[in-house]
């Protein structure tokens, strides 16, 4: 999970690697590249660069993450149930 598109709003993101030394040197800290897919078509999305401390790792498969995105959040990751939104 990453806070995207703004603080307090969380999105599923897939860690795809490290952007390289040039970007890390420019930012002055270690960072990672995260792809945030759009719903319901995960072939488009946003590539963002964030420090590892801003990424919350989930214990789910990439397949489950993409099912969640494609279903617009209706299909919860395996073994987890989505609660009802509070009124």
Predicted segments with their positions:
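Terminal membrane-proximal soluble interaction domains of membrane-associated proteins
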Residues: 1-87
């Amino acid at each position: 999970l990453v806070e995207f598109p703004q603080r307090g709003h969380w999105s599923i993101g897939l860690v795809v690697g490290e952007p390289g030394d040039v970007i890390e040197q420019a930012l002055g800290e270690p960072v990672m590249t995260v792809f945030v897919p759009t719903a319901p078509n995960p072939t488009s999305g946003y590539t963002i660069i964030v420090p590892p401390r801003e990424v919350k790792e989930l214990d789910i498969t990439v397949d489950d993450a993409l099912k969640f995105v494609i279903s617009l959040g209706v299909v919860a990751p395996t073994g987890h149930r989505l609660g009802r939104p509070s009124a």
